[in-house]
Amino acid sequence: MFESVYNLPEQIQKAYEIGKNISVNVKAEDIDKVVITGLGGSAIGGNLLRVFVLDKCKIPVIVNRDYVLPAYVDSKTLVIASSYSGNTEETLSAYQDAKAKGAKIIAITTGGKLKEFAEKDGFDVITIPSGLQPRAALGYSFIPLLMLFVKLGLIEPVDDQIEETVKVLSDLRERYKPEVPEEKNLAKRLTLKLWNKLPIIYGISGTTEVIAERWKGQICENSKSPAYFNVFSELNHNEIVGTESPKHILGLFEIVMLHDTEDHKRNAIRMDITKDLIKGVVSGVNDIYSIGNSRLARMFSLIYLGDYVSLYLATLYQNDPTPVKKIDILKNKLAEIKD
């Protein structure tokens, strides 16, 4: 897993090359909404895309994480079925639902039943390289979708942003890699603060919300320890009140607040006020800021730090970050149960 994380800049570059060669039959004038259906690591790519194009794409982009699709899916809907393995049962079910509803479908996968079904049914397939854990293939599950939106004319070209992202991540890995000592390594310093604590990751709606979710997922899957996330300003309308009792539990909370230059000004203010309200109640509050000029580079700079933190936590807990045994057991048990 360390190798996969280290190689993310190269993965993004390869994913960009895949994206440049995408050719699909779908036309922008034939669709009025996009639904990206997937789970886990595959869904994160779609959710990142949703946030990235939020103020750029003129049609709705929705992420679906279920066996079925919403009732509004119809012949004017582009359904992107994303499953790294190609065998995710919820995604396969949603694919069949999309087909039944007459939607336009594009699959993004390494193979499996999803590729088999899509090719048999005459739908476009974006094939990405196999051999990784889905969560380690974020570049492959996100960048081709981004390039697809460019090809369809739904957003402006992003070539310069991808180039900067590769450069920023290449620089950051030289700061975060295992050989760099703690005093010069932000990833290691933050990991030590989260170790033997309960990490709570806070993002901001429209900018870092999905990145906070990614941090949570990476900590859970890689370090095999619990983590949670929430989003401003919603958490100011409920969760903030739950910081009075029980004090012995709250004292284990280590908060990470993710900041970006495009955060809504009022949400940035909310973050500062919230920090003052919970200091002294929780174990600590850590402010983490994005790096880079373009939106894409800044997003991935935060993602990359979270990836490294999750791996260093796994090391401290003496857990192998790669296997996800409980997910495998769950899938096997589900496979034994027929409807």
Curated annotation (Swiss-Prot):
At the highest ranks, the source species' classification is: Bacteria, Bacillati, Bacillota, Bacillota incertae sedis, Caldicellulosiruptorales
Q: Which reaction does it catalyse?
A: alpha-D-glucose 6-phosphate = beta-D-fructose 6-phosphate; D-mannose 6-phosphate = D-fructose 6-phosphate
Cross-referenced PROSITE patterns: SIS (PS51464)
Q: Locate the SIS domain: which residues? A: 22-164
Query: What is the role of this chain?
Result: Dual specificity isomerase that catalyzes the isomerization of both glucose-6-phosphate and mannose-6-phosphate to fructose-6-phosphate.
Q: Which cysteines are joined by disulfide bonds?
A: none
**One example of a Gene Ontology biological process annotation:** carbohydrate derivative metabolic process
Q: What is its EC number?
A: 5.3.1.8, 5.3.1.9
> Which family is it part of?
Belongs to the PGI/PMI family.
Quaternary structure, from the entry = Homodimer.
Q: Which UniProt keywords apply?
A: Carbohydrate metabolism, Isomerase
What top-level class of enzyme does the UniProt entry assign? Answer: isomerase
By its UniProt entry, which InterPro entries does this protein fall under?
Glu6P/Mann6P_isomerase_C, SIS_dom, SIS_dom_sf, SIS_PGI/PMI_1
Active site location: E221, H237, K331
Q: In which residues is D-fructose 6-phosphate bound?
A: G41, S42, S83, S85, T88, R135, H237, K331
Named from the GO MF annotations, one term is: mannose-6-phosphate isomerase activity
The organism sits in which domain of life? Bacteria
Please report the name of this protein according to its UniProt entry: Bifunctional phosphoglucose/phosphomannose isomerase
